[in-house]
Amino acid sequence: MRRMLVGFFFLWTFAAHAQTRAVAPTSAAANRIYSPGVNAGDYIYVSGQGPRKPDGTLPATVREQIRQALDNVKLVVEAAHLTMEHVVYVQVYLEDMTQYPEVNGVFGEVLPKTPPARAVLGVAKLPDPGIQINAVAVRSLAEKRAVYPPNYKSAESASPGILTGDRLFVSGMLGVDPATGQVPDDPADQVDLALDRMKSVLEAAGLDLRHMVFVNPYLTEKIPTRVMNERYARRFEFGNTPARATIEVSSLPGGAHIEYTGVAVRDLKQRRAVRPKNMPPSPTASPCVFAGNTLYCSAKSGFIPGAHGGVYANTTAHQLRQTMRNQLDNLEEAEMTFDQVVSTNVYLDDLSDVRAFDDVYVQYFNGVLPARTTIEQIAPGERKPDKDDHYPDLEQMSLIAVRNTSNR
């Protein structure tokens, strides 16, 4: 009988650990679109948090707004019974990049011990003005440590990398000379410099670029995508590249025009690229890549694949349906469903389309809604078809899903 009880206890413990759960502070208002946070076992994913207080008021100063956004992250983390020391990675979105020094200062005050890896991005518009911060927290601190390349010097209140038991989270590595603060004139040199800096963080953790499972190249209009892709493809094995979300942004810290940030897996045996049968291998991005039980999926748009592929829908809602079809192809190839998605990043051409986007988005999820970050990264463009009747992307979405969990 005792053996049966012990066995039941371990089975219950495993089930509790494996089940995905929504995380919400007691002060959080009901939300039909996303969860404030999602507990996915070893990691907690925190939705983008704005600068408003729980009562809806906006602090008076920029510095207070930055601190409040961090406090809102803290409320979600604490609702998962963790502390800010468990936060390993954050992305900070700013409408005004001149506020970056204040962001750096507040982070240094709030997270002085082992600051998380961090990427800071200038965007056109946010759901709440000023700032938005999302986060990833690790449940176990046993193997958490900061990673610094040799001779690394920086005034940043962020760790270049944070190592956990199974992953490495890499801060945004800018195409800026760290010794002089100068931005090279040649876009190709800027790309190479940013890639070299990302590589140095990996090597300081005993890893290399083969270990990357997801990369965000963030670039301004000054970096041609063709140049970025050509230099990037040289660094990775064809057909086995990391998943990727390449996002044009309005600005980056230090006057940079390119920044790489991402996630690596420590054990290469835990890494596996996933590619639907209707997609050819790519020199720049795998559709999705596993890091153990976690699936990182590239940003997808409403692009119809195939010989005559392109974006043919002319509204955000219609494009999103094709985006979800594309992401479902990825998930099904990994033998997963939308119900195992724990976090999404949504990039809209025009944030005023968010309601139309949401009305379609929620139809694809049952039970626990994923954590979510939503931004308008650059000013809206013209919504006109080209000579082939292709429309510009009005939305993009990347996602993270966790296998062997259920959120029903």
Segments predicted by a language model, with ranges:
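Bacterial N-terminal signal peptides
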Residues: 4-15
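N-terminal presequence-like segments and the immediate start of the first folded domain
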Residues: 17-71, 75-89, 93-196, 200-214, ...
